[in-house]
Amino acid sequence: MGMGDYLSKLLSDKYGIQTMHHEGVYDLVDGKLDRSKAYQLAEPEIQKILEDNPSIEVVIDLHRDGVAEGTHLVTEVNGKPTAQIMFFNGLSRTKANGNIDYLKNPYIEDNLAFSLQMQISAANKYPGFTRRIYLRGYRYNMHLKPKTLLIEAGAQTNTVEEMRNAMEVLADTLDNVLTK
């Protein structure tokens, strides 16, 4: 079971949060890994899912971070080794040029606020679980819905156990933010 499946199962079974897990692959072009257009390729399908399911309140784009082989993004939560996570936000702007007009995003503030709520909730209950909120110029399809989270969960250097433990903490944190 992949981590998206596991997170979806935790949210629905343990917390009663109805989920839909989309497993589209958008970074393989003609059988070769190419991430340069992944968000552009995903956008129409994600838009359709949101249009067909207007009750969706939260969108989570779950990734593993790519780090140097010697880097291990792990902390201990409740005595268990747990992969750390990082919230990633697209601002549709650059420091040098300001707003990127062709990358409109009406939900920048909503998504930043949601990331910050998640970060604070996790820091209060699970110190060390989150890394930082990472800000970049692109929008990463975060313009499609308020309460969109792009999450870098662990990295390729984390074990399955560490990742599963992280999904448990992430699910609990999401439940805390959404219901409290």
What does each of the following model-derived ranges do?
Residues M1-G2, L33-Q40, N105-A113, T157-N165:
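Soluble non-cytosolic domains of exported or imported proteins
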Residues A68-K104:
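A short, glycine/acidic-enriched catalytic loop
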Residues Y15-Q18, P54-V58, T82-Q84, G128-F129, ...:
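Loop/turn elements at helix/coil->beta-strand transitions in domains of secreted/extracellular proteins
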Residues F129-K180:
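Active-site-adjacent mobile loop/cap segments within catalytic or ligand-binding domains
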Residues T19-H21, V58-D61, M86-F88, R132, ...:
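Structural recognition of the beta-strand scaffold that forms the well-ordered cores
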Residues V25-V29, R64-E69, L91-K95, Y138-N141, ...:
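Solvent-exposed loop/turn segments at secondary-structure junctions
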Residues M1-E57, D65-T75, E168, L178-T179:
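N-terminal catalytic or cofactor-binding beta/alpha core of small enzyme domains
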Residues Y107-Y134:
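Active-site-adjacent substrate-binding region
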